[in-house]
């Protein structure tokens, strides 16, 4: 029973991670309104004619439907197990699956509002933030299921780990803000912003620079955290943050090509997942 629940939770988490990347591809390619302002239908149809923007957005919606099914199944399975069905004893897997279901409902609502309002930046940012929280919750559901990791004692997360997690989440949100307000090209050059430590230009430069400052702070903090920790998890975070910095530098210095923009989101999602795992 435990293994099935854990496998289902990991499957849902993996699909959620892939959905985050696909959502970024929708934004990067300008396909957010590939289905028009219709929701849940696409251009008023269940099976619309598929040009490239429509194909990308429709694929994103189908992937979201798959994630919805997995999360709903996980919550239903958790409820079934908590009632002790199919076994001779009560077996509680925890309530994180219910939290994931609530986050999924919020995510679906934000997705609908985002499309209906023609992609305002604030809803797109909230949409990504909620997706990251959903991913984290599913990872917690998989890792903290009783019996999922036999023989490994559970210790409560220390404050440095929680600070790293909070800093990572804020960095992700400022990255979404930078991308969705059109500030990605406001800071040329790397690591400085237009060769300035304190940009003197528009508010878009300040938004972009704030995202970078959070990223630099995250790197310094996780190195300090890893050096103090006796666990290997923080060092995996350090490695992924270094990779993310390399992708970001290449992206900015090469004029923001779409593949590197997508890679930036993919590695950013991996950093977030690694932070969650390192905290547990």
Q: Which residues make up each language-model segment?
A:
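Polytopic transmembrane helical bundles with strong interfacial aromatic enrichment
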Residues: 1-280
């Amino acid at each position: 029973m435990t293994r099935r629940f854990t496998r289902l939770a990991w499957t849902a988490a993996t699909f959620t991670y892939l959905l985050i990347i696909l959502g970024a591809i929708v934004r990067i390619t300008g396909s957010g309104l590939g289905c028009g302002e219709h929701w849940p239908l696409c251009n008023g149809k269940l099976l619309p004619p598929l040009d490239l923007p429509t194909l990308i957005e429709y694929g994103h919606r189908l992937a979201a439907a798959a994630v919805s099914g997995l999360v709903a199944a996980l919550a239903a399975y958790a409820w079934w197990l908590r009632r002790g069905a199919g076994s001779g004893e009560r077996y509680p897997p925890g309530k994180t699956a219910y939290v994931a279901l609530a986050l999924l409902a919020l995510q679906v609502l934000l997705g609908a509002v985002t499309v209906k309002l023609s992609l305002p930046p604030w809803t797109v940012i909230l949409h990504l933030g909620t997706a990251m929280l959903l991913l984290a919750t599913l990872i917690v559901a998989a890792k903290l299921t009783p019996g999922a990791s036999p023989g490994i004692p559970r210790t409560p997360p220390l404050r440095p780990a929680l600070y790293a997690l909070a800093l990572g989440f804020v960095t992700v949100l400022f990255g979404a803000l930078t991308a969705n307000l059109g500030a990605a090209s406001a800071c040329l050059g790397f690591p400085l912003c237009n060769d300035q430590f304190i940009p003197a230009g528009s508010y878009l430069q300040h938004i972009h620079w704030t995202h970078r400052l959070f990223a630099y702070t995250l790197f310094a903090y996780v190195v300090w955290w890893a050096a103090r920790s006796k666990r290997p998890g923080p060092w995996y975070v350090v490695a992924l943050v270094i990779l993310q910095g390399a992708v970001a530098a290449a992206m900015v210095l090469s004029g923001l090509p779409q593949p590197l923009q997508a890679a930036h989101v993919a590695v950013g999602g991996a950093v977030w997942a690694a932070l969650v795992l390192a905290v547990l």
